[in-house]
Amino acid sequence: MGHMVNAVKQIPTFLDLGANALEMDVTFKNEEPTYTYHGVPCDAFRDCIRWEYFNVFAKTLREYTTPGFDKYREQLILLVFDLKTGDMNNAQARTAGVNTAKQLLQYYWNNDNNGGRAYVVLSIPDIAQHELIKGFKETLKKEGHENLLDKVGYDFSGPYLPRLPTLDETHEAFKKAGVEGHVWLSDGLTNFSPLGDMARLKEAIKSRDSANGFINKIYYWSVDKVSTAEKALKVGVDGIVTNHPDVIIGVLNENGFKDKYRLATYDDDPWETFGK
């Protein structure tokens, strides 16, 4: 999964390096998704201030994920929108969810008329913002496009302070949001942070694989080193966020990995837990 792809020119760059998914940062203005932009600080050796207007970026993503367009790339099957809503209260987050649904419906799904086919994950930075998901889902239903929810998954990634939520707290937030299935969970550190023991990641994977697990897929960020990618795969992640997709492709082709792992294709179900 290509990390921090926020400018239109970066899309083909990451795809040419082998990415089959892209992660974008969505910055809001008055609860309206306005820019794809991360800002400083960010991962080491990256340009933190690349950006585009959200509607332009969404329309461009449609061209890369809709058969028939010159830009179409069959490999691009998943889009992760990292929603920068951390400073919003729950009511504001609901409005942000409504507006995100409207903009994706218009600019990416083209009002469900030959729209982009990629799966979408909404990554929300705070478990207290469960109303964002409700607003998003209810808007698509109200607009008559409930079917598009089949293509959408959800991730609560925080908050990080004063501590990360427990898995039970995260599960409760999904219940409040009315989400059962289509659950992704992210874990990780910036690419310049010490790796650590991956304790939370291992706990999440154990929960995913349990009989009553609520998580469908787990992805880890930001993985730029061969050694880190190898450790993440051995632990059992479903996805890897990276600034260097070619490095991950190389690891997937190594002995010990190439017989167990491969890049996902459009025919794979992103909401199905592997191995269950």
Swiss-Prot record:
Keywords: Cytolysis, Dermonecrotic toxin, Disulfide bond, Hemolysis, Lipid degradation, Lipid metabolism, Lyase, Magnesium, Metal-binding, Secreted, Toxin. One of its GO terms (cellular component) is extracellular region. It catalyses: an N-(acyl)-sphingosylphosphocholine = an N-(acyl)-sphingosyl-1,3-cyclic phosphate + choline; an N-(acyl)-sphingosylphosphoethanolamine = an N-(acyl)-sphingosyl-1,3-cyclic phosphate + ethanolamine; a 1-acyl-sn-glycero-3-phosphocholine = a 1-acyl-sn-glycero-2,3-cyclic phosphate + choline; a 1-acyl-sn-glycero-3-phosphoethanolamine = a 1-acyl-sn-glycero-2,3-cyclic phosphate + ethanolamine. GO terms for molecular function: lyase activity; metal ion binding; phosphoric diester hydrolase activity; toxin activity. It is an enzyme of class 4 (lyase). InterPro entries: PLC-like_Pdiesterase_TIM-brl. SUPFAM superfamilies: PLC-like phosphodiesterases (SSF51695). Its EC number is 4.6.1.-. Expressed by the venom gland. Disulfide bonds join C42-C48. The active site is at H3, H38 (nucleophile). Belongs to the arthropod phospholipase D family. Class I subfamily. This is Dermonecrotic toxin Ls4SicTox-alphaIII1i. It comes from Loxosceles sp. (strain 4 GJB-2008) (Recluse spider). The lineage of its organism: Eukaryota, Metazoa, Ecdysozoa, Arthropoda, Chelicerata.
